[in-house]
């Protein structure tokens, strides 16, 4: 191997077993990275890096299309989606495609169309990825300067950031358009047990929208995860889309200020670390959203939330025992608290028993039975509808608890089914992904800062204290 200008630059690269394995411009000698370091070989080859990213997008979209069609092929209309291990169809159903009152699936054709569109798109992206990886120009700076870049060119980097923000903003507006003009979205709070409806009365008040960001993340507050009506969700997307588009235009038109130039490390690996940090935050927020929120993730499709299944059990047995003659207003439980009903710390009437800890649950099947001071005893005695009983009995036996081998539900529940809730899968997977992306952020941020500071080896081994100590032998 030729001696390179500085071996220190390549301290982190292992020697190849087969030194003859060469890809022009992508081998260890010219890039300092071996084949297994993947896209690190392409740091300075913008054309090839474009190919890698387009091909990666193709793989993602291919998975979406193939998995979509797989779920359509296995879908059984007689069973709820959450009993079939589906994670993609619930998202399409939430957008109002193919479903009617109560979340009943009326037509699976829109789901089929979605899968086919994603497959076709993935073929286009796959072709583009292969073209740019193998045939296209290695670098874009000469032939297509608009698409070329140098990592340390701060102005170009913020322009690229701006373009990304505009695309994200347009994505947020797509949901707004779907909800307002193209058939509406599924609203679990629609009267009578949920339905697809157009959103007409958007919440655009900044006090309401940004109030969510200022709420405590704990208990009944629940930060943005506590959002429980579609007007606020769609209105929030109007705000988010506008902020992203305006921020994108701002970043395209301006150069970074001096404080920003000083504060950030301006290198490819630094941008990777910033992106990983952002994705990590997204993952953790998505985890909490899918676990606790039954408006953006309707229980008709994703199954009940944990608190919802617990409250449903208390409600189901209250209904049963009330029919058998129990006085649910005054019956005492084994601890001396109310067996069926008790008071919360703030005085509302809530369900008694172990489910007391979930007293701030809000769910469409339960809210009609609340009055100004919590659960209304007279409504519980006279106004319970059959659909509320059916839904709570169903949710009681489908708690989002379960293990990887699909032994799901409450361990002591004799009526539970062999089932793992999509909420469990989606929340767990996004927590794990969020965690690993955070570790990736720390790793790449540390390397980027070290490179910027001019040392990549870590501590200088010449000054190791152990070198000055008496040998053990």
UniProtKB/Swiss-Prot annotation:
UniProt subcellular location: Plastid, Chloroplast thylakoid membrane
Positions of transmembrane segments: 69-93, 134-155, 178-200, 255-275, 291-312, 447-471
Residues the record lists as Phosphothreonine modifications: 15
Entry keyword annotation includes Metal-binding: yes
In-chain residues carrying the UniProt-annotated modification N-acetylthreonine: 15
Entry-linked InterPro entries: PS_antenna-like, PS_II_antenna-like_sf, PSII_PsbC, PSII_PsbC_sf
Keywords, in A-Z order: Acetylation, Chlorophyll, Chloroplast, Chromophore, Manganese, Membrane, Metal-binding, Phosphoprotein, Photosynthesis, Photosystem II, Plastid, Thylakoid, Transmembrane, Transmembrane helix
GO MF annotations, alphabetized: chlorophyll binding; electron transporter, transferring electrons within the cyclic electron transport pathway of photosynthesis activity; metal ion binding
Membrane topology label: Multi-pass membrane protein
Entry's Gene Ontology BP terms: photosynthetic electron transport in photosystem II
Propeptide positions: 1-14
Cofactor annotation comment: Binds multiple chlorophylls and provides some of the ligands for the Ca-4Mn-5O cluster of the oxygen-evolving complex. It may also provide a ligand for a Cl- that is required for oxygen evolution. PSII binds additional chlorophylls, carotenoids and specific lipids.
GO cellular component, one term: chloroplast thylakoid membrane
Signal sequence range: none
Binding, [CaMn4O5] cluster: 367
Family classification: Belongs to the PsbB/PsbC family. PsbC subfamily.
HAMAP family: PSII_PsbC_CP43
Subunit structure: PSII is composed of 1 copy each of membrane proteins PsbA, PsbB, PsbC, PsbD, PsbE, PsbF, PsbH, PsbI, PsbJ, PsbK, PsbL, PsbM, PsbT, PsbX, PsbY, PsbZ, Psb30/Ycf12, at least 3 peripheral proteins of the oxygen-evolving complex and a large number of cofactors. It forms dimeric complexes.
NCBIfam families xref list: psbC (TIGR01153)
Record's function text: One of the components of the core complex of photosystem II (PSII). It binds chlorophyll and helps catalyze the primary light-induced photochemical processes of PSII. PSII is a light-driven water:plastoquinone oxidoreductase, using light energy to abstract electrons from H(2)O, generating O(2) and a proton gradient subsequently used for ATP formation.
Protein name listed in UniProt: Photosystem II CP43 reaction center protein
Species annotation: Saccharum hybrid
